[in-house]
Each structure stands twice: as C-alpha cells, then as structure tokens.
Regions:
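Short, solvent-exposed loop/turn segments at secondary-structure junctions
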Residues: 13, 48-49
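Short glycine/proline-enriched turns and hinge-like loops at secondary-structure junctions
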Residues: 19-20, 41-43
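Acidic side chains
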Residues: 12-14, 41, 68
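C-terminal boundary/linker segments immediately following FHA domains
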Residues: 5-7, 28, 36, 43, ...
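Short, charged beta-strand/loop "edge" motif centered at a coil->beta-strand transition
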Residues: 2-33
C-alpha cells in the first residue's frame, strides 16, 4: 500500500493554484496492494469531486479509476491517471 498526498504546497503531488481554491493538504490517494485507488478529501475548504455519469459528485472518500476525472477546489480537474504522473520525485 502506498499513500500520496495532494495539495497546494509541500505534498507528493503539487497543484499550482494562485487563487488558493486548493488546500495545502487537500486530499490523499491510496494505491492499494491490489492496484486500486482510494481517494480521500482531507477536510479541504473547497472540496473534492469525481465526475460520474456526466455530473460532478462531491466525495469525502471513494474508490476511483485512473480514467475518472477528479476535481479539486471547484475548478482544477484532471483524470486520476494524469494526476498520478505529476508525482514529485524525492
């Protein structure tokens, strides 16, 4: 199992956001031992949503697939697969 943090600053995956719609620590995605992805909103100010059946569904926690579109802070959206490619090397 591997956990990646997502946010505006100091996280594994940094989302640039001059408007500060994305929290410093906005969400976490856990890659499970069987290869699934579990997305958790970390109490962000502006929420996390997944696009399902053509509509944005706010989530606190949910399993998501690589091809699903995820939205952070009301405007920053991309597929989970694209997001995972943005991981910083340490």
């Amino acid at each position: 199992m591997r956990i990646l943090t997502i946010g505006r600053k100091g996280t594994d995956i940094v989302l640039n956001d001059s408007e500060k719609q994305i929290s410093r620590l906005h969400a976490e995605v856990t890659v499970t031992d069987d290869g699934r992805y579990y997305l958790v909103d970390c109490g962000s100010s502006n929420g996390t949503a997944v696009k399902r059946q053509g509509a944005w569904k706010p989530i606190k926690q949910a399993f998501v697939s690589e091809d699903e579109e995820v939205r952070f802070g009301g405007f920053y959206s991309l597929t989970l697969g694209t997001l995972l490619k943005m991981k910083r090397s340490k």
